[in-house]
UniProtKB/Swiss-Prot annotation:
Binds 1 Mg(2+) ion per subunit. May bind a second metal ion at a regulatory site, or after substrate binding. Transmembrane segments: none annotated. This is Ribonuclease H. PANTHER family: RIBONUCLEASE H1. It is found in: Cytoplasm. It catalyses: Endonucleolytic cleavage to 5'-phosphomonoester. One of its GO terms (biological process) is DNA replication, removal of RNA primer. GO terms for cellular component: cytoplasm. Keywords: Cytoplasm, Endonuclease, Hydrolase, Magnesium, Metal-binding, Nuclease.
């Protein structure tokens, strides 16, 4: 039987693009781990993706994951759009390169051994873990320490 893990994620960007951060909380039984990091120049969508990626990459064995995000971009991208992108060699339906392809590919890899249920929650609606992730992400965005090497303006 796989371990059942809950993951809560959020991304934040002060300006878009601008300094950004992500926050994630992993919960297994009564154990909890909080993750966050800030980037000097990025976008909100990249930080939403990073929150999910880093949280999944933190897991050390195959798990059954309930991943909660307030990002429709992440949820729809990973449950719907990614299948077409992969069929079209990471191009959109109108043959343009997929935005944030580096992170979509990394997320696809991070899912690997896990069974992930992607659950959308309304942001800024009083959901305690989402509020905590938002605070982690905003705090990290306010004190960025890393460069988002995959971000390209435009």
């Amino acid at each position: 039987m796989l371990k059942q893990v809950e993951i809560f994620t959020d991304g934040s960007c002060l300006g878009n693009p601008g300094p950004g951060g992500y926050g994630a909380i992993l919960r297994y039984r009564q154990h909890e781990k909080a993750l966050s990091a800030g980037y000097r120049l990025t976008t909100n969508n990249r930080m939403e993706l990073m929150a999910a990626i880093v949280a999944l990459e933190t897991l050390t064995s195959a798990c059954q994951v309930a991943l909660f995000s307030d990002s429709q971009y992440v949820r729809q991208g990973i449950t719907q759009w990614i299948h077409g992108w992969k069929r079209r060699d990471w191009k959109t339906a109108d043959k343009k390169p997929v935005k944030n392809v580096d992170l979509w590919q990394r997320l696809d890899q991070a899912i690997g051994p896990h069974q992930v249920e992607w659950i959308w929650i309304k942001g800024h609606a009083g959901h305690p873990e989402n509020e905590r992730c938002d605070e982690l992400a905003r705090r990290a965005a306010g004190t960025p320490t890393q460069d988002d090497s995959g971000y390209t303006p435009g």
